């Protein structure tokens, strides 16, 4: 009986270690700048890749520096987006191993998968525009006219190529046969697609003025993506309203359906999760919670960074902080500005 018990623990461990393979590639953010990626055997030196991603690396070496940059952008952008929340995305720094906040099918892992999918396609699309990827250039000029007084020009972000190559790489782990439970694979693939949908929706017309004395008689326009930080904020809104789902039979196969209203299928645009998260008030390394003790809070805010919410009702302590700012700035003809440095004391607050 003891053998079966230990075997059960081992199988459970294997299942959990496979669950988050889809974002292990974020470990690429740790890749040293000194690593040259000009030969296929260099792919073996990259951390966090599954076999199918390793193959993509070997056959698309020219993409790898861009994908490494995408991994760095995911980490930076996630931490920035959640700086005012109890869960502050700091556990993303642990890649390629994670705590349960990103290892299980949580709301937090839903956000990171969506952001990762959006970021890799965004970064590749932008790299095409800047000429950083051989064989990939600006997006084709649209067939329709931009309107009177406007003309197509510039270099549009190559979103189609970004999504094609980005999804091949980021979705590869979830499409492997041995990549965790079917429910988790479906959840992560769904949220990755949500990330790409938000990315597509961020494509907007950008224009530059031309004309005598700045008259802007003609505008040259192209289609460009919003900055990744703006896309992350849209995804954060979806995170806050995410739907909890269950994996149950629907017709001839199992599908993910909303837990509380399982009479309808999951909407393509909604972020979903399988397992509820803790409140992240107290430190619990296993759960990926650093707690909010000594986290800075905003005494006058009504949002998630307010001292009431951030401190989970434990109260807060004030402290005085010295801030150095530019002051007494003067404009000099022509054309520069000089400023002095001024110091002032401000009151800040940290959670008990």
Curated annotation (Swiss-Prot):
A single GO molecular function term of this UniProt record: signaling receptor binding
Biological process annotations from GO: cell migration involved in gastrulation; dorsal fin development; embryonic viscerocranium morphogenesis; heart looping; heart morphogenesis; intracellular signal transduction; negative regulation of canonical Wnt signaling pathway; neural crest cell migration
Lipidation (O-palmitoleoyl serine): 213
Residue(s) carrying Sulfotyrosine: 273, 280
Main localisation: secreted
Residues listed as glycosylation sites in the UniProt record: 38, 88, 298, 302
Cellular localization per UniProt: Secreted, Extracellular space, Extracellular matrix
Highest taxon listed in the record's lineage: Eukaryota
A GO-annotated cellular component: extracellular region
Keywords: Developmental protein, Disulfide bond, Extracellular matrix, Gastrulation, Glycoprotein, Lipoprotein, Secreted, Signal, Sulfation, Wnt signaling pathway
PTM description: Glycosylation is required for protein secretion.
Disulfide bonds: 78-89, 128-136, 138-155, 207-221, 209-216, 281-312, 297-307, 311-351, 327-342, 329-339, 334-335
Signal peptide: 1-22
Tagged with keyword Glycoprotein: yes
SMART domains xref list: WNT1 (SM00097)
Note from the entry: Xenopus and other lower vertebrates contain duplicated wnt11 genes (wnt11 and wnt11b) resulting from an ancient gene duplication event, but the second copy has since been lost in mammals.
Family recorded in the similarity comment: Belongs to the Wnt family.
UniProt cross-references to PANTHER family, sorted A to Z: PROTEIN WNT-11, WNT RELATED
Function of the protein: Ligand for members of the frizzled family of seven transmembrane receptors. Shares much functionality with wnt11b. Signals through a non-canonical Wnt pathway to activate Jun-N-terminal kinase (JNK) to regulate gastrulation movements. Acts in a non-cell-autonomous manner to control neural crest migration, probably acting as an extracellular signal from surrounding tissue, but is not required for neural crest induction. Acts redundantly with wnt11b during pronephros induction. Regulates cardiac morphogenesis through the activation of JNK, but is not required for cardiac differentiation.
Name of the molecule in the record: Protein Wnt-11
Natural source organism: Xenopus tropicalis (Western clawed frog)
